[in-house]
Amino acid sequence: MHEFQFVVFSNPVAGREAEYNRWYQEQHLPDVVKVPGVVSAQRFQLADNSTMAHRYLALYEIRTDNIEAVMQDIYGRVGTAEMPMSDALDIEGVAMHVFAATGPKVCK
C-alpha cells in the first residue's frame, strides 16, 4: 500500500467566505473521505502575512496501490449528489496536486 497526499489550494468567492468555510468543512471534506482509499482530510488557513495566491489548503491522506483509480473516483463524484460543489468556491483559482510519499512518516 502506497501513501499519497492530495493537496488542494483554494479561495472563496469574494464576500462568501463564511459559506465557503461551512461547505468545505461540513460537506466537502466528509464527502471526499467517503471515497475508498482516502483515509483523512484536514483544512488549513494561511497563518502569516505572505502574499500567496491561495489562502486555504486542504490535505487529503490517501493509501492505495492505484492512485489513478482513487483520483478518477474523486473527480467522477465532483458535482454529483455524492459530492455537491458550492458556488462559494472560486473554482477558477483552485490548484490541485498529488504527491507520493518518498519515505516513512517521521513522528516524535
Predicted regions span which residues?
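Macromolecular interaction modules
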Residues: 1-108
